[in-house]
Amino acid sequence: MTQGSPRAAARARSGFARAVRAAGRTATALLVQAALAATAAHAAHAIAQYGEPKYPPGFKHFDYVNPDAPKGGTLVLANPNRLTSFDKFNPYTMRGNIAPGIDLLFESLATGSSDEPASAYGLLADDIAVAPDGLSVTFHLNPRARFSNGDPVTAADVKFSFDTLKSRQAAPQFAAYFADIARAVIVDPATVRFEFRRHNRELPLIAGGVPVFSRKWGLRADGTRIPFDQLAFEQPIGSGPYLIERYENGRNITYRRNPAYWGADLPVRVGTHNFERIVYKLYGDGVARLEAFKAGEYDVLVEYIARNWVRRDVGKRFDSGELVKREFRQHNGAGMQGFMLNLRRPQFRDVRVRQALDLAFDFEWLNRQLFYGGYTRLDSYFADTDLQATGTPGPGELKLLEPLRAQLDPAVFGPMVVQPNTNPPGSLRANLLKARALLAAAGWTYRDGALRNAKGEPFTFEILDDAGSAFEPVVIAYQRNLAKLGIDARFRTADFALLQKRLEAFDYDMTTIRLPGVQVPGPEQFARYGSKFADERGSDNVIGLKSPAVDALLAALGAAETREQLLDATHALDRVLMHGYYAIPQWYSTTHRVAYKRTLAYPQTLPLYYSAEGWVVSTWWAKPGN
């Protein structure tokens, strides 16, 4: 019930978050060399959005890997999300359920390091050149780069991949994410240039994160092509370190390390991908998954529910030391996990109503009774980072906010929103009294046994969740408080596939969604909060936000030339979003809870910005003799 909670998987439904992150988006991307128009661009092994990359030319490996890690063994994992089956290998289309681990087959021009926020190092590219005017970036491809079929990776493949991802055959999030990249231009067979619609310091990194696949993927023997959005179980042709060895009934899949993998000796790959095989077994629900782990059926359990960590992740194998439990600090930033309100529904359009719903949520009781004190309340869209707004707006924020004053709640110019608290001297009763006053001011009063508007219509809505969720006790507690206000909140569950479809169609009133944290906000913020995405089916603008003021702050964020300007824009955005009460913020943890077999080992130096599953797959290894 933390950051990786149920809806984290749902928001990755189209493959956008998973695929772009797999392509190097987390640390973002990198770029190549080549001459531009007037002045020659400077070629480099890596780039950073601000300042210089941490690792210099000629570096041997990242600090958080073990360059001497032994190779071999099999890593067995369970469902990394709520999906209990898969029906495709293509992670770049909207429909269907993606096979877990499929990102192991693909690479991008560049990849980020996990111990710095916004840099990118050559992967498929061996150098990168950003134009002096910042309006393009050129990548030169490593001549050794090969796809799994043995073909060299060419500029034509890069352009084909980019053009496909921006087309209607790919999930719409890609077109949104790459919107400011106007085109990919083939300079020569080994060189590709990306041209931008405007200057933005992150765009070279974003271009470097474009996933690359072969033009032959989906090509039939007779030369005709299977439409990209119809590719399902056709073997992907990527350049990544693993191949699909076998799969069964959409429930199990085994990856084998490619013995001819071209990039094993690259500095960005040394000490990584140490397992000979990686197996995913998909279980029907969380109970079956946990019991299978305790029975020794798979090797690593990443626990997202604090109560389970204390009460259920126990037993004789833990007592004997065969299974080990550890918490690992991470600095990813909490992002926003909360009960998201769908502004497309009329009952949620008044900010006073939304604030009242926030006042009815008793986090402190939940943390004591259900979570064993394992969480911290979210109070920002950028919590646990320097991107979070605090106090009153500073001079840089005011410079952005003042021109928007007429469009904003005056409260935005005062102290930052403080989440309601029920610890003494606060109380749930006091919060509900405030909520009742806000609802009355918005035209909702209690009569005839329910909260009603001027037309006599009762205040009702549905809280949507997936059938395998552990959120029911949380929802029941929230329902109880809402009922005291006269609000009828119904709890509805759906299987994961149906849930995905409903989210894509914005067919929900309220649902728990997690928007992952970032260290350097970029296009994902436009996709989440930009007005033009509010009506685009399958977009990440889950709340349906249409705000010219927010659009203006997003534009300022995109135009930031320095880290200071980025902070001012993000603080202002955070302040406006929080004062809008578009979500009832839930909670976060600053650690990854990981239980694992003692036959596994990991580097002693931890990365800073990482997912637990990705870290295990990419840098752990099997102890020799096991």
Located regions from the model:
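Detector for C-terminal structural segments
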Residues: 46, 79-81, 96-97, 101, ...
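Aromatic- and charge-enriched surface segment that lines or borders ligand/interaction sites
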Residues: 65-70, 92-99, 127-171, 187, ...
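Surface-exposed binding/hinge segments that line
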Residues: 140, 175-222, 241-248, 392-405
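N-terminal lobe/hinge region of extracytoplasmic solute-binding protein
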Residues: 43-133, 163, 170, 237-241
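Aromatic-rich, solvent-exposed beta-strand/loop patch
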Residues: 122-126, 148, 153, 195-215, ...
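Gly/Pro-rich hinge or "lid" segments in bacterial periplasmic/extracellular proteins
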Residues: 100-116, 208-277, 284-288, 295, ...
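Extracellular/periplasmic solute-recognition and catalytic clefts
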Residues: 183-186, 245-256, 281-345, 352-356, ...
